[in-house]
Curated annotation (Swiss-Prot):
Ligand binding (ATP): 125, 157, 162, 195, 221-224, 231
Single Gene Ontology BP annotation: pyridoxal 5'-phosphate salvage
Enzyme class: transferase
Pathway assigned in UniProt: Cofactor metabolism; pyridoxal 5'-phosphate salvage; pyridoxal 5'-phosphate from pyridoxal: step 1/1; Cofactor metabolism; pyridoxal 5'-phosphate salvage; pyridoxine 5'-phosphate from pyridoxine: step 1/1; Cofactor metabolism; pyridoxal 5'-phosphate salvage; pyridoxamine 5'-phosphate from pyridoxamine: step 1/1
CC terms in the record's Gene Ontology section: cytosol
Protein name per its UniProtKB record: Pyridoxine/pyridoxal/pyridoxamine kinase
Protein's organism: Shigella boydii serotype 18 (strain CDC 3083-94 / BS512)
Subunit architecture: Homodimer.
Positions that bind Mg(2+): 136, 162
Pfam families found in the cross-reference section: Phos_pyr_kin
Function summary: B6-vitamer kinase involved in the salvage pathway of pyridoxal 5'-phosphate (PLP). Catalyzes the phosphorylation of pyridoxine (PN), pyridoxal (PL), and pyridoxamine (PM), forming their respective 5'-phosphorylated esters, i.e. PNP, PLP and PMP.
Catalytic reactions on record: pyridoxal + ATP = pyridoxal 5'-phosphate + ADP + H(+); pyridoxine + ATP = pyridoxine 5'-phosphate + ADP + H(+); pyridoxamine + ATP = pyridoxamine 5'-phosphate + ADP + H(+)
Amino acid sequence: MSSLLLFNDKSRALQADIVAVQSQVVYGSVGNSIAVPAIKQNGLNVFAVPTVLLSNTPHYDTFYGGAIPDEWFSGYLRALQEHDALRQLRAVTTGYMGTASQIKILAEWLTALRKDHPDLLIMVDPVIGDIDSGIYVKPDLPEAYRQYLLPLAQGITPNIFELEILTGKNCRDLDSAIAAAKSLLSDTLKWVVITSASGNEENQEMQVVVVSADSVNVISHSRVKTDLKGTGDLFCAQLISGLLKGKALNDAVHRAGLRVLEVMRYTQQHESDELILPPLAEA
């Protein structure tokens, strides 16, 4: 009779630099399905915690899956601590969340985790919706972000629409967007990266605005017309990777934007509807 082998030696536990909490698809390149390989290309280790598990994005003619049950979700988080797999943890990132209850569970886990990791970087991408689609998450998620995750985050990466929802302010011009972002800053929340600020349509530019208490930096990139999904998830993966590799915030944002453009163009060259990662020149 065979006996079950138990891995009880926690000194042998696999360690990660980042825990990435967001969506996962079986087919496609969104959420952790693009973030994890992008982070690994940067030479960092990552644990992926799914919030929803889907066959693909809803942009296909068939679509299956849904939110991870709370019991499973909390268990995924708890298991990382039970296995002593977080000794070297440096950052937690969040993307698409399936339910408001997941946000509350995650916030409780992060609060406890920070007691052992006081320097932990928490970066929140408050995925709520966009100008074209409006809110495409459950209606109680914006308040859950405000109540539970924003007070824990050091940095957030909303688009213009999400910034408006979180602050209740109109952000359709640069000055109002900057003012809204500054209204969110606190002793904990040190910076806001607005990922779709008003750009120059005539010059085919888009702007990313980095807002902190003492500075505002506007970074312009070429605009690529595309229907590709997952570019925001890729941007956040590149941003957190750059920060953990020692890049200053503005430099990390700039490099993340350039990498997203590179990936989009590479994907278009290969005539794919899903992002394809080319080799990273500098790991």
